[in-house]
């Protein structure tokens, strides 16, 4: 069998965090009743005219600046003509000839080191509606709430060679866009979607192979599976002497396989022409400077600040800043309790464990930084011990409970009264003569068994340090 390399380029669609759509005043809120966020403009009614949302341009330019793109200072919209039920106008307003941003790059890091992935362009466009297929009724219905929601499409060059590089690129893009506040980039809600273009070729070959486009990829895990699956499918075809067909394929993550949707179109198939209802966009130097001045702290700057300001190790700072949401929780909780390393420990250890156990993403954390700060203070004051704190934190993670109220209602405060504890410890000593004898015979580990029995007798509420001290005294 020949040696093949995979060549991958991405088209990443990002829904922008504007309150209204790109060409009309309809709401972009996710989750509304079907066909309630619509008007004549976004449903393509005759005589309706689009008006460009200025915030869309500003977000697009901000993303372009953050990815080292050249900003196109004279930009235009174009019509992309095609018929599909979720496209009420029978064309999409997009950008082909003069996209808003060009020639950028994103630095990624994998186990193989650092690498630059080039960005061919970033263009603005409107989203289509959402088709829902009812397999029982054998019909399809359409919700136009999403029609006209503003998108940027970030088109990479075919610079990636593995699923690992693709995921690193997507994670870096998502972090950058989230930090800018341009989008929440939630794959499960469709506010970030990636179409993956894949081809294979023999190692050392200069010419690209025939590419296929993979769709229906709504998680990083699905993207990685689809890349590996399509790579194997194409290699198998070539090894059998057959040709790879240029087509769009739909990935089914449950079956871990794909099927052909349609032949892959080229630009000429869409008969693009300049959008007649919109004037060109002129982005002046002054406007670019204003957008740049409003740019918030991005991940690289935040990472450096955490190491310096909070004296946090680089590894911890990387984990804390991977998600803007987690970074926001860390900073807010630290501001409230003034204990950055202890807040960091709860996020790095218990939060990451619970996220993994529940197959959740850091962006799905829903507890308040106020409650995390309160928990840190409770432990620091000795009000609860570490084992009780873990129990309380699990309730914070799942239900965002007030830890002070929960500890009070469930009588979880630590037993720190030495007089009260001495009686319990003496009873434990009397009930475990063998452990006492072992301790007196030099087996120091025997005290651990006595501490454990005391903790059991106090239902975990005793302070282990106090228990240890009193045991030593009584023995």
PLM feature segments, named:
Residues 287-294, 301, 331-338, 372-384:
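Extended, non-catalytic structural segments that build the interaction scaffolds
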Residues 63, 230, 333, 346, ...:
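Amphipathic alpha-helical segments in well-ordered regions
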Residues 281-282, 317, 329-331, 342-343, ...:
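Extended hydrophobic-aromatic, low-complexity segments
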Residues 1-297, 314, 335-339:
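Basic, nucleic-acid-interacting segments
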Residues 189-202, 270, 307-329, 340-358, ...:
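Core structural elements
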Residues 444-475:
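Short, amphipathic C-terminal "tail helix"
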Residues 362-373, 377, 386-456:
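Strongly charged, low-complexity linkers/loops
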Residues 2, 311, 334-343, 381-384, ...:
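Structural motif
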């Amino acid at each position: 069998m020949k040696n093949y390399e995979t060549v991958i380029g991405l088209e990443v669609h990002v829904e922008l965090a504007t309150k209204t759509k790109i060409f009309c005043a309809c709401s972009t809120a996710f989750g509304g009743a079907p066909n309630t966020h619509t008007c004549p403009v976004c449903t393509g009614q005759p005589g309706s005219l689009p008006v460009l949302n200025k915030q869309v341009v500003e977000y697009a330019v901000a993303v372009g600046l953050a990815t080292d793109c050249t900003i196109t200072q004279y930009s235009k919209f174009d019509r992309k003509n095609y018929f599909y039920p979720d496209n009420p106008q029978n064309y999409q307003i997009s950008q082909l000839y003069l996209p808003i941003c060009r020639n950028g790059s994103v630095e990624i890091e994998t186990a193989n080191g650092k690498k630059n992935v080039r960005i061919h362009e970033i263009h603005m466009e409107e989203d289509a509606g959402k088709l829902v297929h009812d397999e029982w009724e054998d019909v399809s219905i359409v919700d136009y709430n999403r029609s006209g929601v503003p998108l940027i499409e970030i088109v990479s060059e075919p610079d990636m060679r593995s699923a690992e590089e693709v995921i690193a690129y997507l994670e870096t893009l998502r972090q950058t866009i989230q930090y800018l506040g341009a989008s929440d980039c939630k794959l499960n809600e469709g506010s970030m979607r990636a179409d993956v273009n894949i081809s294979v070729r023999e190692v050392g070959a200069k010419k690209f192979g025939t590419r296929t486009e993979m769709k229906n990829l709504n998680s990083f895990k699905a993207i990685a599976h689809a890349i590996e699956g399509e790579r194997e499918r194409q290699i198998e075809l070539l090894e059998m002497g057959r040709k790879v067909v240029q087509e769009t394929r739909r990935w089914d993550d449950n079956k871990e396989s794909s099927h052909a949707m349609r032949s892959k179109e080229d630009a000429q198939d869409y008969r693009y022409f300049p959008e007649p209802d919109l004037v060109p966009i002129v982005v002046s130097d002054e406007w670019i400077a204003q957008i740049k001045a409003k740019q918030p702290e991005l991940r690289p700057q935040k990472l450096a600040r955490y190491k310096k300001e909070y004296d946090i190790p680089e590894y911890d700072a990387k984990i804390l800043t991977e998600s803007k949401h987690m970074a926001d929780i860390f900073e807010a909780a630290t501001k409230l309790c003034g204990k950055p390393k202890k807040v960091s420990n709860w996020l790095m250890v218990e939060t990451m464990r619970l996220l993994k156990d529940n197959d959740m993403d850091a962006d799905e954390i829903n507890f308040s930084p106020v409650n995390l700060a309160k928990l840190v203070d409770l432990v620091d004051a000795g009000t609860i011990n570490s084992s009780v704190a873990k129990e309380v934190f699990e309730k914070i993670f799942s239900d965002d409970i007030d830890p002070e109220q929960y500890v009070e209602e469930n009588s979880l405060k630590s037993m720190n009264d030495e007089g009260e504890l001495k009686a319990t410890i003496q009873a434990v000593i009397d009930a475990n003569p063998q452990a006492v004898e072992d301790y007196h015979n030099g087996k120091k580990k025997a005290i651990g068994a006595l501490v454990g029995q005391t903790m059991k007798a106090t239902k975990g509420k005793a302070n282990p340090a106090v228990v240890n001290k009193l045991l030593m005294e009584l023995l």
